[in-house]
């Protein structure tokens, strides 16, 4: 029976194939051409519509996609050697100023000098940081003229080197963003730069003031937004802080801390949205994350410029500062994490979150391993305690925070520009390789915590006149606390 079925299907198959062969033998080339033409004519409108949609979607994508932002180069200001001071020299200046009656005028105020000396000894600052000329002469010069002189030397020094290294002409700059927190004269620092370098009349310039040590990342984010709107142009970001005008000569201890930490420094950064600059750029900007917790009174008031009881202006740092900084940092990390962490870390974080919320409230929060997302960390060199805390909470190794510690040791707290000195350190050490990811993170008054993420487009070598050129062979150093 089975054999009969097989024979039947074979006969049926052969018959069908024979029929098709006979039919096909009657179809010639002309018939095939007519068939093709008929179907093409019938579907011409459909084909045209599909082609139009493809072209339209492609054009729409090209017009609306975020434009890449490249970091062509950056320059950190290296002050002249005559501005270099050791801790002993600095405290000698303080005692001399007190004896001359310029500050802390009574003998009972000796403890204020001792208080600052103790902070300096434990600060992580080295013996070669810089203070401006106005604070090294007697009587002290803290007026507008001395303050302008310091700022001009820093900004013009960084910009001159940047233009020299990149070959970009000032007339090519279409966007300028300057940030300086406490020194904001009229005309603005941005206008001062426009005047000095004769920048073009239609330049888009902004001057950010009062935004603290995290303003460098804010300035980059603002420039990034402008580069999305204005095509085929360069943007310059300048980050600095003025020390001359901000030396506090009163007796409020919470205001004396800034005297011990802040030093002369500044940086200029050249950004571009021109596709042809990719070949020579060092980095591409991947993400910026900005967190501002100023709606909370404790956050808003933890670092405030104000007058003391004697009418002397200074910056007050409250006891809430560490708690506020930790909270703001936590929000920034929670926002940045999903953008940069690998899937495995995201899942671990999510599972822990669900367990803690619904099953075990006592369970500790999961800290993602950001070492899987970044090769290099540029943590704002605001102070030894800040670096220690981030190293501990993010479970980083001493190598990961080396750039921050060495920047604090060599240059002190240079405010918003410190993250650029740290990036320059990493380059000078020859550690920056193609594809490496960098996390710049800065905290500042307001209270704010801001992050920028970069990726290296090539093996990056230090630029000419790097601030580390004259001392790289001596770093890293052991820091005794």
Curated annotation (Swiss-Prot):
One of its GO terms (cellular component) is endoplasmic reticulum. It catalyses: a very-long-chain acyl-CoA + malonyl-CoA + H(+) = a very-long-chain 3-oxoacyl-CoA + CO2 + CoA. InterPro entries: 3-ktacl-CoA_syn, ACP_syn_III_C, FAE1_typ3_polyketide_synth, Thiolase-like. It is an enzyme of class 2 (transferase). Induction: Repressed by herbicides such as flufenacet and benfuresate. Down-regulated by darkness, low temperature, drought and osmotic stress. It comes from the Eukaryota. The chain crosses the membrane at residues 4-24, 44-64. This is 3-ketoacyl-CoA synthase 8. It comes from Arabidopsis thaliana (Mouse-ear cress).
